[in-house]
């Protein structure tokens, strides 16, 4: 449980704070120093409700922050003809990116392609079973509201970072601004975003 919280906190700090910290001399207050997970690489998976421009951009910026802080070796992130395509980006991360600390797991990518009737329940079932019994993922990036809703539960204890969710509290992803309700789930919450 503690490792899950550490993994989620680490990725959230890197993705949200690194751009701010990289231009400041106060990095000592926000340590994002790369480290292994008990001598092993952190294993990361990804899920989304379906292709969406913001999801790819959020993933690209997260990877840039990971590069800026040394978690992933600096490289040119491939462009895509489809600005909402995270699959090709994930394949590149899994196959071609280099890191001594992270492994983007090739077969730990799920997109429901906005199919709420068939693909979403199927993906949720497969993901939750793997997270509970697979012991091969340390952290999930849940991009968007559907992904956050599907992974924010007590059925598993793998760290989850929810990004690009419209309203995590109203959507039932987290319980409040101050507490997600789960030790292994982190989501960015801005209560004034839609005021």
Regions inferred by a protein language model and the residue ranges of each:
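Short hydrophobic alpha-helices and adjacent helix-cap/hinge residues
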Residues: 2-195
